[in-house]
Swiss-Prot record:
Described function: Condenses 4-methyl-5-(beta-hydroxyethyl)thiazole monophosphate (THZ-P) and 2-methyl-4-amino-5-hydroxymethyl pyrimidine pyrophosphate (HMP-PP) to form thiamine monophosphate (TMP).
Top-level division of the source organism's lineage: Archaea
Stored InterPro entries: Aldolase_TIM, ThiamineP_synth_sf, ThiamineP_synth_TenI, TMP_synthase
Name of the featured protein: Thiamine-phosphate synthase
Cofactor: Mg(2+)
EC number(s) stated in the UniProt entry for this protein: 2.5.1.3
Keyword terms, alphabetized: Magnesium, Metal-binding, Thiamine biosynthesis, Transferase
Residues that, per the record, bind 4-amino-2-methyl-5-(diphosphooxymethyl)pyrimidine: 36-40, 68, 106, 135
NCBIfam families: thiE
Reaction it catalyzes: 2-[(2R,5Z)-2-carboxy-4-methylthiazol-5(2H)-ylidene]ethyl phosphate + 4-amino-2-methyl-5-(diphosphooxymethyl)pyrimidine + 2 H(+) = thiamine phosphate + CO2 + diphosphate; 2-(2-carboxy-4-methylthiazol-5-yl)ethyl phosphate + 4-amino-2-methyl-5-(diphosphooxymethyl)pyrimidine + 2 H(+) = thiamine phosphate + CO2 + diphosphate; 4-methyl-5-(2-phosphooxyethyl)-thiazole + 4-amino-2-methyl-5-(diphosphooxymethyl)pyrimidine + H(+) = thiamine phosphate + diphosphate
Record: residues binding 2-[(2R,5Z)-2-carboxy-4-methylthiazol-5(2H)-ylidene]ethyl phosphate: 132-134, 162, 182-183
Species in which this protein is naturally found: Caldivirga maquilingensis (strain ATCC 700844 / DSM 13496 / JCM 10307 / IC-167)
Amino acid sequence: MRLPKGIYGITDDSYNVKNHVDAAKVFLEGGVRIIQYRRKEGSIRQMLNEAKEIRKLCNQYGAVMIVDDRVDIAVLSDADGVHVGLEDAPVDEVKRRFSGIIIGASASTVDEAKEGEKAGADYLGAGSIFPSPTKPDYRILGLEGLRRVVQSVSIPVYAIGGVTLESIPAIKATGAWGAAVISGILAAKDPLEMAKRFVKAWDEA
């Protein structure tokens, strides 16, 4: 499955949306075509119910659905893939046990990017590019660091961390496949309108 270029929406329920499903709907209606369901707390039943709802929405819009961390939820909800962080399940083990699903890996250095690709990741989330309210303790990679990561691997790289509307042209100029956004869209007064603006900014950059 070809990964969509451009804006990569990550769900959250702590901003100007009702819940994770509503966040996914905002992204999709705004033109985003890859969605990550990212819930850190909650029961398996709750996560699975939300994931299945998001799966239905993604099907309606022809979008790719990724689940953060939880391989079990990804498989049970029929998601297209799973994103595993540096502290999560090893990429190669997930790849071996669940062939056929998209696997994303996190990277904050060139070495981590190369390791992720070697382990079998289908794409990378590289960052934090800028200081981020979602991940305040993360190492800052910066635009030049992002460029080095992009040049060090042959798989798609999505920039993540502190991405703003104004930073989209500079991120695209590094050769990144796309940019992951959470608060930049969901914390806006009008998240749907902001999603549309992010998508347009990428397309026109």
